[in-house]
Amino acid sequence: MIRKEVDFGGRRLQLETGRMARQADGAVLVSSGDTVVLVTAVGRREMKPGQDFFPLTVNYQEKAYAAGKIPGGFFKREGRPTEKETLTSRLIDRPIRPLFPKGFMNEVQVIATVVSVDRDNDPDILALVGASAALAVSGIPFNGPIGAARVAYIDGKYVLNPSYAQLTTSQLDLVVAGTRQAVLMVESEAQQLSEEIMLEAVMFGHAQFQPVIETIEALAREAGKPRWEWVAPVADEALGVQVREKATPLLQEAYALTEKQARSKRLEDVQQAMAVEFGSDDAGRGDMVRGLLKKIETGIVRGRILDGAPRIDGRDSKTVRPITIEAGVLPRTHGSALFTRGETQALVVATLGTKGDEQIIDALQGESRDRFMLHYNFPPFSTGETGMVGSPKRREIGHGRLAKRAIAAVLPTDSEFPYSLRVVSEVLESNGSSSMATVCGASLALMDAGVPLKAPVAGVAMGLIKEGARFAVLTDILGDEDHLGDMDFKVAGTEQGVTALQMDIKIDGITREIMAQALQQALAGRLHILGLMNGVLSRGRGELSDYAPRIITIQINPDRIRDVIGPGGKVIRALTEETGATIDIQDNGTVTIASVDGEAGAAAKRRIELLTADVQVDTIYDGKVAKIMDFGAFVTILPGRDGLLHISQISNERVSDVHDHLKEGQAVRVKVLEVDRQGKIKLSMKDIPQ
């Protein structure tokens, strides 16, 4: 067993290998405080025949026992991955994927298992570090290691690896990962911070995780397995020359077409023609031809951009595609918008709900509720393809979370706008940057629904082409530019600052200056888009949709909650059935009444106020005789509140039989004489006009 330790943000970070999971190629136990994550890496020694992509799988899983819990449900065991697990799996995948050598297509699986967790820090950083360490000691070809850190911004200062408590007061939650030389991945949400603060946060995190990289390198030197004797496939030079001569002019013609579907069809025709001419019946040779065509395409697109020629669709490097915006496009929804940017289009719908519609999240750290949900759907027809339709894939979950982060910073507080909010983005067309179209559409749909956002939010995706010292930063990238470029850099925010930033870099050598230029170019693009959005809708509509619930909030004495609920829920059930309103009661006495019909909500409010009203001594009430006894009658003066009208208090004259003066159901006016310590009420009809 080999163990290494390093001080990381004021906490001891420990890496251990050789004690657990010894049959995996690489296994590292990462711990900090009471949080422990076991990360394993296993690779296949042989590539599958015909494999033409790198099959890397990353699975992050949280075990309930890690927090001393037993899973819910009938089977009492962990089920499908939670959203948190899916997002963390993507977080690990993104910075390690570019570090495997080109041409390496053997299957690799990384599994990170949270086996113990405290309530102080998120295990995701430990899982990222563990994945890097497990690969570093495994012998699998990997050009790492990487380090990772979380950065907060509190009271004007950067904080490394903040606790959950610190994050509640932070203006920034940023995760950065990279190698010694370069930043490879950034994921963040922010409270409208400037581009300068965001860039400094990235550089701060990169500097702070360098000791972690050194520790992983020390662990690998001492405990690492011999590196695999893997050699990149040898290129067929003669075939390369033949394919290049034949295909280059055809591919140049294809990339001269600015319309995506026409271009895709032409590229497909070229690929089929080259496969027929050079592929023969050898599957390996066919793979080589496809790989050569991909290289030629990459060279054509990148070369044109670096030479200053127009991009694939005819734009220069800083121009945003044409944008059309419509708000209120669906008649019965609470809010909707159709946002179209070039060949990317999103139909975004906002729905207002009550507290009962909030999402309940059962995490290792405890149960919580989320009043804001954003769901992103990417159907196959959006790219002119067929495919499976069903539960969301990892990509859809990741894009939805990015858009949610972008919008969350401008939402009103629960006290300002007591609604739960669900936004759904249906991507109808896609040619790059559909997640940023979702951000723009979500902002518009929420404002169309009457949500008082602090400011409109827009997003833009940036790209980078870099060859040696030459580089070009691209605004509003297309899908092809994303695939063939060196960086995918999404920035969302308001006129005041950044609310979300996501960056994936595929190469080394991205300098601070390049990132600064990309951020400033993104700001210009964002402001342009916001100007167009503001021309359609610049703030929340003054009124809610006719079909949205109206919410009334009142405060009652917590001791009176039982009066509103009634025995077995009888009273509140009757209230909801008779008024049609939805009623939610918190333990602190906050009552939320929701109803599409405003009058129904007002009626429910009046009845709750009567149910919880205190009976006042010497006050006259209009009551109803509930039950007659030999010694008097019980009179209901408020809902659920009966008082005793003694036979001696019915009249100034002597009463021998109560039935001579009162009948059940009779309306009477009574005065409260006394409310004793047990809450019993004494009433009188004497000297009160009936």
Swiss-Prot record:
GO MF, one annotated term: polyribonucleotide nucleotidyltransferase activity
The protein's Enzyme Commission number: 2.7.7.8
Cofactor or coenzyme needed: Mg(2+)
Domain annotation KH: ranges: 549-608
Reaction equations catalysed: RNA(n+1) + phosphate = RNA(n) + a ribonucleoside 5'-diphosphate
Gene3D superfamilies in UniProt: GHMP Kinase, N-terminal domain, K Homology domain, type 1, Nucleic acid-binding proteins
Source domain of life: Bacteria
EC primary class: transferase
GO BP field: mRNA catabolic process; RNA processing
SUPFAM superfamilies assigned: Eukaryotic type KH-domain (KH-domain type I) (SSF54791), Nucleic acid-binding proteins (SSF50249), Ribonuclease PH domain 2-like (SSF55666), Ribosomal protein S5 domain 2-like (SSF54211)
Entries under InterPro entries matching the protein: ExoRNase_PH_dom1 (IPR001247), ExoRNase_PH_dom2 (IPR015847), ExoRNase_PH_dom2_sf (IPR036345), KH_dom (IPR004087), KH_dom_type_1 (IPR004088), KH_dom_type_1_sf (IPR036612), NA-bd_OB-fold (IPR012340), PNPase (IPR012162)
Keyword line: Cytoplasm, Magnesium, Metal-binding, Nucleotidyltransferase, RNA-binding, Transferase
Location in or out of the cell: Cytoplasm
Domain S1 motif: start-end pairs: 618-686
GO cellular component: cytosol
Subunit structure, as described in the record: Component of the RNA degradosome, which is a multiprotein complex involved in RNA processing and mRNA degradation.
Protein's job: Involved in mRNA degradation. Catalyzes the phosphorolysis of single-stranded polyribonucleotides processively in the 3'- to 5'-direction.
Cited PANTHER family: POLYRIBONUCLEOTIDE NUCLEOTIDYLTRANSFERASE, POLYRIBONUCLEOTIDE NUCLEOTIDYLTRANSFERASE 1, MITOCHONDRIAL
Entry's family note: Belongs to the polyribonucleotide nucleotidyltransferase family.
Protein name: Polyribonucleotide nucleotidyltransferase
